[in-house]
Amino acid sequence: MADLKRTQPLARDAMAYVLAGGRGSRLKELTDRRAKPAVYFGGKTRIIDFALSNALNSGIRRLGVATQYKAHSLIRHLQRGWNFLRPERNESFDILPASQRVSETQWYEGTADAVYQNIDIIEAYGPEYMVILAGDHIYKMDYEMMLRQHVDANADVTVGCLEVPRMEATGFGVMHVDAKDNIIAFVEKPADPPGIPGNPDFALASMGIYVFKTKFLMEQLRRDAAEPGSSRDFGKDIIPYIVQHGKAIAHRFTKSCVRSTAENEAYWRDVGTVDAYWEANIDLTDITPELDLYDRDWPIWTYAELKPPAKFVHDEDGRRGSAVSSLVSGDCIVSGATLKKSLIFTGARINSYSTLEEVVMLPDVHVGRNAKLKRVVIDHGVRIPEGLVVGEDPALDAKRFRVSEKGICLITQDMINKLGL
């Protein structure tokens, strides 16, 4: 019987708990009205869909999402797109906003507190394992592989880790490991990150993914909640304590990342800045992008609105509706405009004689005639006035719009309104 249990998927005995309450302030105005996990990505999905899809594709059928900052857009998306799990099949999907369940504190105080405040719900479901996930990264990963390593090693916690160049790891929590990937120390954003044994130019950076046995995690959360000096955070409190007093191991992302081909690199992106967000979206327009959204074996689930197909109209010199090396979603009408290497979400209306190059356009944007836009991100519902030119004069752009370190313009409706056009 023990041998039979070893061959059965561990994911069916696990609950995935997604931490989705963060603002993501480095995305500037893109998160003024929505939490970072609710930000649109890839022409059809939201950022949170990747963590949830990984859980579902891995075989996990109990999902929870903790929300906090400006959660309406996120909650509405989850209600529409993730309501197909059924209790009668031993499945569940719970949206868990901060609600003063165990204290009179209105907000979740930290990532660990976001789990602790819902401890009664978790214990009622009774999963054997907990998979704690960050809801704001873009990647494809089979959590079953990480669960299996956790059980085989009889670990107290298993931490998902990325191999990154050592001097790029200063912005992460970094694992100091031995030759068997046992975690010796956990260092938060170190100035001099410890290297990997045998590969000293690289470091193991935390992905914000943790696997625990549920009973052990509940014990740690209750212990931490009783500590008056704790910040109630996994990275700052829970994980360092277990490293010091228990058994913590590192799980390398390369062991469980989902690739379309064996030659593909392990793809993981933190799209936490305007530059990173724009670049990750525009990368999808490549002939063979690193992130394969067309993989039928590992689909990214989301809310799919009932929309008509995209339409391209007019076929005259200088007024030809066309798109080259671009992704154009449903319910878009490209009317005599030219798109190059751009990603367009649903509901766009792009009018004649306009040219768009390397543009990321969120849903329901209207572009007037004769507009010229290059290297921009356009927020949801913006009305681009006729004849607007962006991307040719950096000094002028900086006076009117948000311009990133790498020269990407972020355009919102409030910025357009101030132009007085």
UniProtKB/Swiss-Prot annotation:
**Any idea which UniProt keywords this protein has?**
ATP-binding, Carbohydrate metabolism, Glycogen biosynthesis, Glycogen metabolism, Nucleotide-binding, Nucleotidyltransferase, Transferase
Where on the tree of life does the source sit, at the highest rank? Bacteria
**Record-level GO BP terms:** glycogen biosynthetic process
Reaction(s) catalyzed by this protein? Answer: alpha-D-glucose 1-phosphate + ATP + H(+) = ADP-alpha-D-glucose + diphosphate
GO terms for MF: ATP binding; glucose-1-phosphate adenylyltransferase activity
| Record EC number | 2.7.7.27
Q: Which residues bind alpha-D-glucose 1-phosphate?
A: Y108, G173, E188, K189, S206
Q: In which pathway does it act?
A: Glycan biosynthesis; glycogen biosynthesis
Against InterPro entries, the record matches this protein to: ADP-Glc_PPase, ADP_Glu_pyroP_CS, GlgC_bac, GlmU/GlgC-like_hexapep, NTP_transferase_dom, Nucleotide-diphossugar_trans, Trimer_LpxA-like_sf
Q: Which NCBIfam families match?
A: glgC (TIGR02091), PRK00725.1 (NF001947), PRK00844.1 (NF002023)
Function statement: Involved in the biosynthesis of ADP-glucose, a building block required for the elongation reactions to produce glycogen. Catalyzes the reaction between ATP and alpha-D-glucose 1-phosphate (G1P) to produce pyrophosphate and ADP-Glc.
- Family membership, please give it: Belongs to the bacterial/plant glucose-1-phosphate adenylyltransferase family.
Subunit structure of this chain's protein: Homotetramer.
Q: What is this protein called?
A: Glucose-1-phosphate adenylyltransferase
Per the UniProt record, the source organism is Mesorhizobium japonicum (strain LMG 29417 / CECT 9101 / MAFF 303099) (Mesorhizobium loti (strain MAFF 303099))
- The encoding gene: glgC
